[in-house]
Amino acid sequence: MKIKQVIREHRSIAILFGFELLVLIWAFCLLFGERTVIDINPENADYFNSCTINDGKLQINQSENEVGIDIVSAEYTNIKLKPGRYNIEAVYSAELEGFDAASWSGGNEMPICNIGVTSGTFIQQLVGSGFNIYTGTSYNSEPFWINSITSCKDLSLKVTYKGYGNITIEKLIISESVYFRYVRFFTIFFIFTLINIIVCILNNIIKTAFDKKIIIGIMAVTVFSSLPMIYRYLIVGHDLTFHIARIAEIAEGIKAGNWLIKIQPDMINGYGYATPLFYPQLFLYIPALLYVIGFPLHTSYQIFIVLINFGTCLISYVSLVKICKNKNLAFIGSFLYVLAPYRLSELYVAGRLGEILSMVFFPLIIYGIYNIYSEEKILTFKKCIPLILGVSGVMQSHLVSILFVGIFAIMYALFNLRKTFKPERLCYLAVSVLVVIMLNAWFIVPFIDSMDMDIMVNGDGILRFQGSGVYPIQMPALFYFGRGTNVPMLVSDEFCLSMGAALIIGIVVWLYAHYKSLNSEKRNESMFALGNITGIFAIMTIVFSLWIFPWDEINNISRTIAVWLAKVEFSWRFLSVGTAFAAFCTVSGLYYAKELNKKIYSYSIIAMAAFTIISAGFFYADLAFGSNAAQICYKNDVDDFALGITNDYQLADTDLDMCKNKQIDVTSDLLTVTSYSSVGGKTEIGVMNAGTEAFEKVIIPVFYYPGYKAYDSDTGEQFYIEAGANKKIMVNVPAGYNGKITVRYVEKSVWRLSEIVSPLTLSALVITACINNRKKTA
């Protein structure tokens, strides 16, 4: 359709395009102009309090200061800035009286003052507030954002003294991040393009296989499920800070040129944490890249959650429509799944990002298994692709969830033993497993190689999660709160651990349809069989999550099984995959109920839709009033001791309280430390061993995870390292040595090889898909 014809036939669309064009022209004009740099002279403050100016430097001394804590010492007002991203830069010297700087290598426990920005009129538009200045540092730079259309004319920069220590501020600079102008322009362009595509599809200007009603429905469900993310702040769930820290560490690795980090070097005050070896983080590169290009950290996370909700809705819909061939039923199933109480509660109250990511791919796995087992005549590798992608998606999201996939996949294979052992199907299943391993080798190989590491998660391996089970009274919950935690053996103050009233109704509908169709020809249909297996599995997951299921007895039956199941931690986690099973069996039940009794079919849909919306609405209202919220704009806002609830990847027998300060220790007075720096996982320490006979040892504030190497920075000569006090890295320095030693984490050669195998496998899959598509087109 030509542009003139579109304008003539769709005047409202033409007006929309015109408005978008004006906004794009405005954004384009903002690309040009000089970079804003404001060099603030410390002695030109508009307000002083208990501080002095000496040689053009702002000084605050503890011995001369009698004001209290958090008192504004200097303020620079009426700073004018255009919309954009800016950095506050400060050059200073900071110290505590009586503090031994020679033994300090950084750390973040003793802030002396805060440098921040405020505005009286742009309270909502100003994002980011500044940073603290700590002992042992001399420079800091942090961003802030002005998200507005017009300029901010009353920005204030404040220096707030914390009540102890001495600080001399030499330079204060506010500088614009010019590249963010381009980020802003292309973000607006992308949003407008997305809006225009949807508008054109809905008005038949662009043809698509998707039904217009379904497109509107998927967008509506995405928006409704993402309402808590359309917020100035982040709702702080149980594990949110842990996952935000993971994202920030990936971003810092990308900035340093290290894309595949295996140790998070800045966690635990720079001692390091081994999360990447044991917790998949492929999808976290999406928010990490958004943060790297200039978005605030919490905004990057919010965008990511919206994408997860959209992906969950789209993938579950496509998986269901491929099976049932009914768009309306597929959408109902997707709607119930995305807005399920357990999913929303895990997403916003618990903040369990890995579990939520795995729920994106459960429907794809169910469809993939259905695809392979329902086809009797023609079975091709193409039919294995959904299963391969689904399992890989879960594997790159959450390892506990892949354990659930394995458990129920084995059960399904045993229930269909005759079909499973047909040579052709068995061959394709084996090929699928092989491709999954090769596709994910870059994570699997380091994970398996590190499984015997002495970390907390490998503790005693005793299965003891029966007490975390759910009571039957909780399962059909209609109203659930947006707060709480898991309380063993109690219900009060618990967050939602429920399948929800809507999905319970769905299971009942399936039971009705199953019973009524037992003696008909329908029982031989693949759709009926799928409903049976997903219905049985849904009920099993409910039973598994209950406190009455005797999980703890497995300790006396099989030690091996107990050790593996102990990784699950909470029995109610079975509800994650159970929610997917319930959604699929609900669709199967509705599919047959429509033919059996239209009243039951209609009333069931109305009841499930109403219960889902009412439940979610009540949950959102309580979430807004009863939860904690925070702005986490940049890395310094992240708690580097956010290790997850159980500190799973902390080295065993280490004391985190001893990590609050970063102390360099030597085992002899003959050994002198001349310099120290630790940036991006690379530690460099200058040492001089005045001894002539024996090795001396220097202990650096970095945890000794297997894989660290120490070598001479100039010659590459390796030094022996071992675990010292509190399992810190202890480097053996030879007699007479005078130089600089580099300590960093080095991947094994087989790990590097696996990082080549995975992209090659992905490339082969893409090429195969393109060839098959070309053949089909021809």
Name what the model sees in each region.
Residues 42, 74-99, 172, 710:
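Extra-cytoplasmic beta-strand recognition segments
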Residues 75, 140-145, 179-181, 657-778:
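Active-site-proximal, structured, solvent-exposed surfaces of multi-pass membrane proteins
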